[in-house]
């Protein structure tokens, strides 16, 4: 999920993506649904490895969780544990016809800065997070602008 810090092995980078890794949340409460990178996490590069990570965690794992903004306690905790600092406290953000909650983080990686924006929505008993990582604000915004929601309909049988 993160730009490759030449001192950190790729296994640790993958564990950062999935809080279900060792020392994190058990596999029963959090799942990474999608992790997409500009290049494979094992491949070192000069620039930040842009990424999109979609994860879902059962709301039942967080008693009292009533809105997406409250989920930023765990989100911020995970980001800070990975060396990020909060740049923008959680705020409402409109994506198409849906309002989500967004928080922004940054981390120095050698001579580069890694930016992370995480958007959260509560849906069907899950806290669903969309995390976008890039090396510039423009790169992150371009990734965020690619997110859209469509109205759910009845399943076709």
Language-model features: locations:
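Short amphipathic alpha-helical surface micro-motifs
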Residues: 16-20, 31-39, 67-72, 82-88, ...
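Secretory pathway targeting signatures of secreted, lumenal, and periplasmic proteins
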Residues: 2-63
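Extracytoplasmic/periplasmic, Sec-exported soluble proteins
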Residues: 46, 63-67, 135, 139
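Short acidic, Gly/Pro-enriched loop/turn segments at secondary-structure junctions
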Residues: 2-14, 68, 139-140, 155-157
């Amino acid at each position: 999920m993160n730009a490759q810090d030449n001192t950190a092995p790729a296994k640790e980078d993958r564990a950062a993506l999935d809080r279900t890794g060792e020392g994190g949340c058990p596999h029963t409460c959090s799942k990474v649904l999608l992790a997409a990178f500009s290049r494979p996490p094992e491949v070192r590069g000069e620039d930040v490895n842009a990424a999109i990570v979609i994860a879902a965690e059962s709301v039942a794992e967080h008693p009292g969780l009533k809105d997406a903004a409250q989920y930023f306690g765990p989100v911020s905790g995970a980001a800070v544990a990975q060396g990020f600092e909060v740049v923008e406290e959680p705020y409402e953000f409109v994506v198409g016809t849906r309002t989500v909650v967004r928080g922004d983080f940054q981390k120095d990686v050698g001579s580069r800065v890694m930016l992370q924006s995480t958007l959260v929505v509560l849906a069907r008993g899950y806290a669903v997070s969309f995390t976008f990582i890039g090396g510039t604000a423009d790169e992150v915004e371009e990734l965020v602008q690619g997110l859209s929601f469509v109205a759910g309909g009845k399943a076709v049988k």
